[in-house]
């Protein structure tokens, strides 16, 4: 066991360094509003040698993909908490909206860039970004569909709702709210924003 301790410490340091590089890259990508940021700049801002970057990432596209994947993983964690929650459909919907808003607030500029990169097929890294965002969208659709069906069964939402159509409309509302919030220089408190969005959506779905 004693011989494994140094290896464990190395793993911690490696993970810390990798996260540090990704945090720096995400900030620079967001601040510049472009993925066209050199590995030299990222290394300098992160306080590491350029060669260190290539220990963790083969190239800039791989680094960008890792940044988006990290955003996806955190959003997926938020979604998983809602799925496993035993609360009412309305309470779970609010918790989902709140959690997603909180994740976007962690790096709004990078979220804006990711959305812009996805919509421009010629942009550097668009394929990697598009793939991760597609997975986020699919996860959201799955959870929203389950919430709508549960809400109808509980009598919280209208019985005649078409779940597929309702999910599309609700998803559009949430996506639009995220995009607007990510571009606001001084957004309202996240809990208040979640309440506003949830109230608006539930009035549309309500029985």
Residue ranges and their predicted role:
Residues 1-32, 36-45, 61-65:
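Basic, helix-initiating cap at the start of DNA-binding domains
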Residues 1-4, 8, 99-102, 142, ...:
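C-terminal peripheral helix-coil segments that are non-catalytic and often amphipathic
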Residues 25, 46-57:
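Short hydrophobic/aromatic patch on the recognition helix
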Residues 30, 54-58, 70:
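Base-recognition residues in the alpha-helical recognition helix of bacterial helix-turn-helix
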Residues 66, 80-109, 163, 167-170, ...:
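Hydrophobic alpha-helical connector segments
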Residues 73-76, 80, 125-154, 164-168:
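Amphipathic alpha-helical packing segments from all-alpha helical-bundle domains
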Residues 104-128:
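Amphipathic alpha-helical segments used for helix-helix packing
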